[in-house]
Structures are given as structure tokens and as C-alpha cells.
Swiss-Prot record:
The basic functional RuBisCO is composed of a large chain homodimer in a 'head-to-tail' conformation. In form I RuBisCO this homodimer is arranged in a barrel-like tetramer with the small subunits forming a tetrameric 'cap' on each end of the 'barrel'. Pfam families: RuBisCO_large, RuBisCO_large_N. Signal peptide: none annotated. Residues 1-2 form a propeptide. Keywords: Acetylation, Calvin cycle, Carbon dioxide fixation, Chloroplast, Disulfide bond, Lyase, Magnesium, Metal-binding, Methylation, Monooxygenase, Oxidoreductase, Photorespiration, Photosynthesis, Plastid. InterPro entries: RuBisCO, RuBisCo_large_chain_AS, RuBisCO_lsu_C, RuBisCO_lsu_C_sf, RuBisCO_lsu_fd_N, RuBisCO_lsu_N_sf, RuBisCO_lsuI. RuBisCO catalyzes two reactions: the carboxylation of D-ribulose 1,5-bisphosphate, the primary event in carbon dioxide fixation, as well as the oxidative fragmentation of the pentose substrate in the photorespiration process. Both reactions occur simultaneously and in competition at the same active site. The keyword Disulfide bond applies. This is Ribulose bisphosphate carboxylase large chain.
Amino acid sequence: MSPQTETKASVGFKAGLKEYKLTYYTPQYETKDTDILAAFRVTPQPGVPPEEAGAAVAAESSTGTWTTVWTDGLTSLDRYKGRCYHIEPVPGEKDQYICYAAYPLDLFEEGSVTNMFTSIVGNVFGFKALRALRLEDLRIPVAYVKTFQGPPHGIQVERDKLNKYGRPLLGCTIKPKLGLSAKNYGRAVYECLRGGLDFTKDDENVNSQPFMRWRDRFLFCAEAIYKSQAETGEIKGHYLNATAGTCEEMIKRAIFARELGVPMLMHDYLTGGFTANTSLAHYCRDNGLLLHIHRAMHAVIDRQKNHGMHFRVLAKALRLSGGDHIHSGTVVGKLEGERDITLGFVDLLRDDFIEKDRSRGIYFTQDWVSLPGVIPVASGGIHVWHMPALTEIFGDDSVLQFGGGTLGHPWGNAPGAVANRVAVEACVKARNEGRDLAAEGNAIIREACKWSPELAAACEVWKEIKFEFPAMD
């Protein structure tokens, strides 16, 4: 058959290029409750209309490709295509637009964050028609949420397991993060836990290196947990990092942790990957282990203001994939985080239902339909003087994690832990009495110093420490 011969499949098919906006820009479209909705910050190349840029994003992240193909006639594009349904300029920014896209639920595999991201952000970010592209937010429909297990246990179950109520939980990342032997590492864990912390933590890059193999670390940390529990009468935990080079190795480490009887594990969910994270979350629920999540590599994805993906999207993805804690920024420490925006995604982690609120960066109303909540972890350059602000900003359902702010105490790890425990209990007591932590925070800490020499020493060491740098971008 010659190339010019007409076949039934080619009837009505016209080869060649067609503008994306003719098919994928549909401003009259009314979104469905079952659609996944996305808000993209789009910066088109010069000469590319915003309608064409928005349509290109919707097309390339769903059914479209660069040319017309005859196999379009073998399916229903109206049923399966993504749609750019609304475009608005970004106030104060030149040639930037928020383009809203809707995706039919049938495009996505049930219970798979991996597939969701592969579709929505997997290919389109390298598109030549765009100078920059950032995914600002997603609306996950109830029908899709219900296909996920979510966090292994959630906030209330964790508090019940730990028998700890009415205050933020306290943690500490063991430093130096690399180079300690397993025995010395376990000793540092023990000192922090016996001093009054609830948790200690492996740093994100502690896996199984020559200086400290994972099995040795797990054993010495378990010993530290049991010894500190016996001395204090409180339930303690250490985030044992199970992240590994393969899923099989990760699960092997999780099984060993369960056999030791420790309460929790840890995973680096972005470097480890969503498939591995979801597998570990399922294992943790089935075996009664809490799961702490570190967001190592997040700033590679979310730091730029006009390209990449906002952390609120990564936070939503984590709640679907599964984790009981996740690092969320501090607002007050050494790592970047604006207060209103940070509290916006903190609510997305903890609450069942969150209303649209653009002032906090929330583009869509999100209903989690009883999916368990995730505890935000404030960590990075914080110390006892930050305690009133952290307690006021994050509330009780949070983990306040002081690494250098514990281990840097001039008297040692245990006194550093005592200082943090005294500070948080003083702040909670003052708050419960009706005092204003924002206005009276420093006075509250100074009052507590009178009956805690450990806190007084910590306050003296860190009284001048600030992490303030002018924004350059």
C-alpha cells in the first residue's frame, strides 16, 4: 500500500502541527470534584502567548505531544486530556502567569504518588516554549485520596503510643553527623534522652558507612533508648534511618529495627523515592513503627521562586505516600521559611480540611477525608531563645528539634537536653496561663533560668546568635 492510500484510520486526520491552545485551552470548562487540579506559575518565552503556554503545560503533562498523531482518533481526548481552564497574571511580576490545569482522575494509577508526579511534572519542565515553570499547588480529590494509606499512624496514635500530651515534642539530631563510631553515637543518644528529650535523630546522610555500619548503630541506639527509658520513666525514641541503596535493603533494616523493639524509623523520602517511601510506610503501619521523614534534597526542587515545585506540593505528596513526621522549616532558624507560607503547609500536613487561602499560598481547598495527619518538625539553627516563638508558631502538635542547640551546650549533651526541656515546659505553662509568648517570650525564658542553671548557661551561650541575611533573589 502506497503512503498516499487512504485508510479508515486516516479519515479525518490531518498531519502536521497544531497550536496547543486550540485543543487544551478551555476557559469554559467547569472542574469536576474528581479532577486533580494544579496551579502552575508559568513564564513563557518571548512571543509565546500565555494561553499557548498554559495549554502546552496541560497537553504535555497529559495526552498531548508535539505533533498531531493519527492514534488520537482511537480514543476520546475529551475524556482523557488535561485542560488549562484559567489564567491570571502574577501581581508585581512581568510576564508571569498562574495557569490552572485540570486532569481527569482516570489518568492516574490508584495509590501511586510516583505515577501522579510522573504525569504532572515528569516531562513538561524542560519544554522550550517556557522560560520557567513552577508547580505551586495541587488539589487532590477525595476519590484519589481514598486510594492511599497515608501516614502509618498519625498524630493522635503517636501521642497515645508515646503517652505524651499537651506540649510540643523535643528532638535532637546527633552531631557530628558523620564520623562517630556506633558506640560513641549511642552514648550521645543516651545523654540527650536521659536529659529530657523525647527523640534523637540520625542525620539524613547517616546510612551505613565504613565508620559506622547500620546494624551496629541500631544496636547501640536501642541500648540507649532502653537505658534512658528505665532511668526517666518516659517513652523515648531514636529515628533510625533505614534509607538504603535498594528497597530490599531498606526493608531488611526496618525488620531488624522491629526485632529490636524500637518505636520508630526514618526515611529520606525525596532521595529514596516515593515508591520506596510508600513501601516503608506500609511496613511501618503493619508492624507498629512510627516513621520520621527527612526532606533532604527539597531545596533543589523548591528554592527557586519561578521554577521547580513549591514545598507545599511535596508536603501533600508526603501525606499521601506516608510519614508521621516531616521537616517543615522553622521560620526563625538558619533555614529559609516565611511564616504565613510555612503555616499554610503546616496546616496542610496536620488538618483534615483546609480552605483556600492565597495569603498563605493555598490555591485550592483540600479535603483529606480523615487521612491521618503528619507532625511538622522544626529543625535547623534553633536554640532556647527561639522556644517561645516556636511554641507559639507551631503549637503542641509539632517536634522542635535542637541539634547544635542541645549538643553545643557548654556542660554537655544531657544539660543541653535539660535546658530545652525546661524552656519548652516554661513556655507551655506561660501560654496556658494566658501570657503572650510573642511579647513576653524573652522574659519567660529569663524567669525559668532562675531555677535551671542548665538553661541559664544555654541562654548565655546563644544570646547573640542570629541567622539574618538580606534576601538577594
